[in-house]
Regions:
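A short, well-structured juxtamembrane/interface segment
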Residues: 68-87, 99-102
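Short hydrophobic beta-strand segments
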Residues: 86-95, 167
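Extended, H/D-rich, highly charged conserved domains that either
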Residues: 94-108, 112-114
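A short, structured active-site edge motif that brings together acidic residues
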Residues: 118-123
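Extreme N-terminal basic, low-complexity initiation segments
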Residues: 2-7
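Surface-exposed, charge/polar-rich loops and edge strands
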Residues: 9, 13-64, 82, 110-113, ...
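Short, contiguous, pocket-lining structural segments
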Residues: 36, 40, 68, 72, ...
Length: 278
């Protein structure tokens, strides 16, 4: 996307991340779904968080209850940077978490347009638009959550450009492309929203950067029908190519809690008549 095209994006100007996080409902653990499946996922999260903490590879502020930052995140980002998927991508959509900060930084350094989710999708304009041609901070500072409030503007999903590569954070992954987030369902929601807006399609690749201790054996991670799968898993040491088979795209209103819908303005706006939970 060139500078002229980027200038056309509508937005509300600079955001206030501190205010967003302070006022956002704490709904990180209410993705909804089958209780047995949720319990199995929760058990795996605890196991991987123990690995990260016990192995001394979790960075501040620690492993638990988050997409954990890890020693080697920069090396993993650099390895992703060397992939064909990266070279072919002009526009990225990324999660806002710390372990993918080096990925966002390198994307801006390489002249890529980056859309970063506002924490918890808690604003009516739920994505930051980080344009490498219009930054007020250097790429490293601009690509942090705090820096995005100075260097980016928030945009509506209908004002975003088509995405070439999706970057998501994970607590755990396996070589088949199965992934496990922190339990809020945000990555799946972002994917479904972007699909319905026509920003991504069947050929859009999904990648993550993780530490080796987060890579589990095949078929260890239970998956729900709405869970997205990965095409690329990148660690500091290797690239794992996955099948990336996709679930049926779109929002599954029956699996969203009332708290989740109420806390995310875009979901409240999109909610169709008759989509009330029983």
């Amino acid at each position: 996307v060139g500078a002229a095209g980027r200038a056309g994006f509508a937005g509300s100007g600079q955001g206030n991340v501190t205010g967003m996080v302070r006022t956002a409902a704490r709904h990180d653990r209410d993705a909804g779904g089958d209780p047995t499946l949720l319990a199995a996922k929760a058990s795996l999260r605890e196991m991987v968080w123990d690995r990260l903490a016990g192995g001394g590879v979790a960075r501040f502020p620690g492993a638990r209850n988050r997409i954990s930052n890890f020693v080697g995140a920069e090396a993993a980002a650099e390895r992703l940077r060397g992939t064909r998927a990266w070279r072919r991508a002009g526009t990225l959509k990324s999660n806002p978490d710390s372990p993918q900060w080096p990925v966002r930084q390198r994307a801006l350094e390489d002249g890529k347009l980056v859309f970063m989710a506002v924490p918890r999708l808690a604003e009516p304009e739920p994505f930051f638009c980080l344009d490498p041609d219009r930054l007020t901070d250097p790429p490293r500072a601009a690509s942090s959550i705090k820096g995005a409030s100075r260097s980016a503007r928030t945009v509506r999903i209908e004002d975003m450009a088509p995405v070439d590569l999706v970057v998501t954070g994970c607590v755990a992954v396996d070589p088949t492309g199965a992934r496990l987030g922190k339990g809020g369902g945000f990555s799946d929601l972002e994917y479904a929203l972007a699909w319905e807006a026509g920003l991504i399609g069947p050929e859009t690749l999904v990648a993550t950067t993780v530490h080796e201790v987060q890579v589990l054996e095949e078929d260890r991670i239970p998956m729900a029908g709405h869970d997205i799968r990965l095409d690329l898993i990148v660690t500091p040491d290797r690239v794992i190519n996955c099948d990336g088979s996709r679930p049926a795209p779109g929002l599954r209103w029956e699996e969203l809690t009332e708290e989740k819908i109420a806390a995310i303005p875009l979901l409240s706006a999109l909610r169709p008549a008759g989509a009330d939970r029983p």
